[in-house]
Amino acid sequence: MARGGSDVAETRARLLDTARHLFAERGFEDVTVREICRGAGANLALVNYYFGDKLGLYLEVVNQAIAAVREFNSLAMTAPEGSDAEKRLRLFVRGLLHRVFELRGVDSWVHRLIQHELSRPTELATRILQEAMAPRIRYLAEIVAELLSCPKKDPRVMHCVASVHGLCLVYSRIVLANQFKAAMPDLASDGPFDVEDAVAHVSAFSLAGIRAMRR
């Protein structure tokens, strides 16, 4: 009996959802098609039917991850045309931190999947970096190079890019983490976290550091 359209869509969606979480948890190599199908409650043959093979399923998951990162990037790359470098940096920091703040507590399967690709790369690693990560890094590198008045290949540029980018992302792991307050209550603020305070701090700290690198 032919499968109904809604059944096909639901089964395919379950396979993708299960694959996303398993690939993000353990990486491509350590996950089997059998595990994915068992978790999705689907017949083993359906991975081949819908996606061709395990790599085809992984490619679909990677495409979803790239789309999610592109949306993330768009919030940090919104400076009006003609904005000076300092304003662009502040808007970059604001966009990134607001997105990190919005996503706190949300399952970060995209981040975990990318981390697996960086540590144990598959044939898709370069594509993920080029299409998902590179646009944001290049955008920030252009800002930093302008602030430093140097070519983008100057080693100071990527040092500063890593510092600014890392400082933004660390808030999701320390300042915003419930575990931080539980483990170090003496350092945790009593009041609610204000993302604009973080934006002001990271922007000022980053700009001061970049200015110091010009000397």
Where in the sequence are the language-model features?
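Short, leucine-enriched amphipathic alpha-helices that occur as contiguous helical runs
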Residues: 8, 12-16, 20
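Short helix-capping/turn signature of helix-turn-helix
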Residues: 115-121
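Helix-turn-helix
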Residues: 14, 22-56, 60-64
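Hydrophobic/aromatic residues within well-ordered alpha-helical segments
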Residues: 54, 61, 65, 132-136, ...
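Hydrophobic/aromatic-rich alpha-helical bundle segments in the mid-to-C-terminal region
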Residues: 105-111, 126-134, 143-203, 213-215
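N-terminal intrinsically disordered/low-complexity leader segments
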Residues: 1-10, 177, 215
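Hydrophobic alpha-helical connector segments
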Residues: 74-109, 157-164
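Conserved phosphoryl-transfer catalytic core
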Residues: 65-77
